[in-house]
Amino acid sequence: MLYDIRLNLRYDYDAAAGGGRHQVRVMPPTISGVQRVIAASLSFAPAPSERSDFSDFFGNNVTSIAFRDAHDALDIRMSARVAVSRPEPGLDVSPDIRRLREELDAVRSLSPGSPHHFLAASDHAGIDAAITAYARGSAGSSAVSTAVDLCNRIHRDFTYDGEATTVQTRASDAFDLRRGVCQDFSHIMIAGLRGLGIPAGYVSGFLRTIPPRGKPRLEGADAMHAWVKVWCGRDTGWQEFDPTNGMRASNDHITVGHGRDYSDVAPIVGVLKTTGGQVGEQAVDVIPVVLEKA
């Protein structure tokens, strides 16, 4: 699938900010065998006093910006054309949890893609006894079957509610509520798998939404999204699952970044020199591109 993606993040401040410094993670990367970025651009208004681009430890695209002059708003616009072609899942040859731990012990690398980075508790996805007990009900004959079942159960057992949680909500709190959004469901799945000894990480990106039959597609109605990557052994490697929708990641999922939890891939983090609050808005368009045949 070929997509044109447009993202607009806007923050309006109650009082003018005298300065600020931020890190922005919204630019999709090229990922071998998954997606290819054909073109991309990122702009800011007002223009920052300083700007630099780099890759973080996990290989995510980061733009660092700083402002020295007073400003009462920040407007961020990203556009990209991305081709997505995820491989079809093959025959499940992943080991069971016991053998997975043996394979994990044999991994000596601490490179960014090493499963060891995704096994311990993290800020948003701590190891929690209640979540581990819930996840144990999905433990199957293989790592993949365990992940599939847990993904489907979270989709079935939890209610999507955009008012129930915030970006600061931890997996244990969302689990108690039995409601939340994609970030919460991903953190719950990550915490549950880690509790079973299965490495799992957080993926941020975009998801194309399809309007109801007969309804027009609305501008800005698509969304930034979150899902889960799971290490399923030496031969199977990393697989991705979307517990919000009870499915594997598909060609409608466009990756922006990945990490241990939301805090590693938040779209924007930083500090402001100001005395008031702020209001943020987000608009996303994920538009399929149909190329005319020659």
Kindly label every feature range from the protein language model.
Residues 50, 54, 106, 166, ...:
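Glycine-rich, flexible loop/turn motifs
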Residues 98-180, 188, 260-262, 277, ...:
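Secondary-structure boundary elements
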Residues 15, 19, 26-28, 44-46, ...:
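Generic structural "secondary-structure junction" signal
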Residues 1, 28-39, 155-158, 183-187, ...:
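Short low-complexity stretches enriched in small and charged residues
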Residues 1-104:
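Intrinsically disordered, low-complexity N-terminal segments that are enriched in acidic
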